[in-house]
């Protein structure tokens, strides 16, 4: 149990990439926690937004791999925000504080929904250059819990954890998926009552994405064919909403492919970001491009051969 937590990679990550804490709101209790790794000269980095159960370090495998290729990557953990507008306003202030005009966003589950809402919120003065949406959704009504959204704040932590764990895979899983679930359960345990209640509120509060406001943003939809908390209907809805999106399908990986299928996820992220190389919105150090592009081409060739 807990293989990932004691792995050399995770411990090296925790030992070398500092966790920063930043306050951008008038309320001092609203603290953003983040890992910012890779070349600071990059002004349009890739930012990772976690699911309900996740902390910033659930993306450590993306941070290690992508910074090794010359990308600047930031992984975040949200403060306690109770509605989407409050989140979007806080996130905008955070980007201002970090002096980032535009960013690429990778959002997992709730993180993907919030990424879309932020793109929508800033559509008149765009801050989002592209989106990677992993196991994500565009309408909170799919969870059939909009009626309970206003009562999460009253529930004790153990009850909230039970709600979240109910969405974790309960069927047979391979060892890597089992390790990923163990790690996410451990991360879930580290979250306090207000953190969990606020995230569940954001996840279930009645809201949907207005696609006409963000239709010009390049999107990659990343989803898992096997078991995941998302219904087929929710996935189909995403395809309809973004008809021009690139699709990155993983055969297996459950709810947390960034942990248990990290090589595939990292490759799809690189393929998505390739389209911005050579522009001012590149997330990579220009001197690293040629070597990195060759590797991506080799990797994508391998994936397409496997699928045939």
Curated annotation (Swiss-Prot):
<protein>
    <recommendedName>
        <fullName>Maspardin</fullName>
    </recommendedName>
</protein>
<feature type="domain" description="AB hydrolase-1">
    <location>
        <begin position="87"/>
        <end position="159"/>
    </location>
</feature>
<comment type="similarity">
    <text>Belongs to the AB hydrolase superfamily.</text>
</comment>
<keyword id="KW-0597">Phosphoprotein</keyword>
<comment type="function">
    <text>May play a role as a negative regulatory factor in CD4-dependent T-cell activation.</text>
</comment>
<dbReference type="InterPro" id="IPR026151">
    <property type="entry name" value="Maspardin"/>
</dbReference>
<dbReference type="GO" id="GO:0042609">
    <property type="term" value="F:CD4 receptor binding"/>
</dbReference>
<dbReference type="GO" id="GO:0005829">
    <property type="term" value="C:cytosol"/>
</dbReference>
<dbReference type="InterPro" id="IPR029058">
    <property type="entry name" value="AB_hydrolase_fold"/>
</dbReference>
<dbReference type="Pfam" id="PF00561">
    <property type="entry name" value="Abhydrolase_1"/>
</dbReference>
<keyword id="KW-0963">Cytoplasm</keyword>
<comment type="subunit">
    <text>Interacts with CD4. Interacts with ALDH16A1.</text>
</comment>
<dbReference type="GO" id="GO:0030140">
    <property type="term" value="C:trans-Golgi network transport vesicle"/>
</dbReference>
<feature type="modified residue" description="Phosphoserine">
    <location>
        <position position="304"/>
    </location>
</feature>
<dbReference type="InterPro" id="IPR000073">
    <property type="entry name" value="AB_hydrolase_1"/>
</dbReference>
